[in-house]
Amino acid sequence: MIKQPALAQEQYACVYAWLALLFFREVDDEGLIQLQSAEIADWLALLKRQPALAASVALLEQKIAALSLRQDAQLELAADFCGLFLMTDKKSALPYASQYPQQEPGMIKHLLLEAGMEVNDDFKEPADHLAIYLELLSHLHFSLGESFQQRRMNKLRQKTLSSLLEWLPEFTNNCLKHDPYGFYAALSQLLLAIVRFDDGKEDLSIVAVE
């Protein structure tokens, strides 16, 4: 008998990488086409099979469908992104761990060091940006496929998830309060659901039982 995780390591890795990109930069014309593509629909359908993710996925599907009804959808999404993630007023949802008092200062640097990673010089945002956490989780899930690193990477994955969950709920709540059209609010809710779902998997190894 083969016991497998509800989502494979590679599937987690791809989803985290996709979410990292969406929270890092504005959706351009090409990105908008991809959001509305059959490929993304298939990915969301895969996630929707998990009961813990179904409601969040359904909400995001609704918001993606609603984009076709928004005039100048790409420009409107760009404005939403700017207002939420680039402004510093009280109606924003800044994607930096240091903006939330629950987070230990400099934690992401320690996590990256343990993973043997560093922030690329081309990355112009602070190192504690949400996208860095998600790229780290993507890397760790891919690394879980290498058996000689599995125990160490799984432990580091748990530390990263725990660190992220210290401030991600408040970030998500800010998105809900300040995103009038709801795409990024729905995206943040899905992210929070995935991180919590991932955090519930103590051991992502594949175990074969005779």
Curated annotation (Swiss-Prot):
It comes from the Bacteria. Keywords: Chaperone, Cytoplasm. GO terms for biological process: protein complex oligomerization; protein folding. Its main location: cytoplasm. InterPro entries: Chaperone_TorD, DMSO/NO3_reduct_chaperone, HscB_C_sf, TorD-like_sf, TorD/DmsD_chaperones. It is found in: Cytoplasm. The keyword DNA-binding does not apply. The keyword Thylakoid does not apply. Involved in the biogenesis of TorA. Acts on TorA before the insertion of the molybdenum cofactor and, as a result, probably favors a conformation of the apoenzyme that is competent for acquiring the cofactor. Belongs to the TorD/DmsD family. TorD subfamily. This is Chaperone protein TorD.
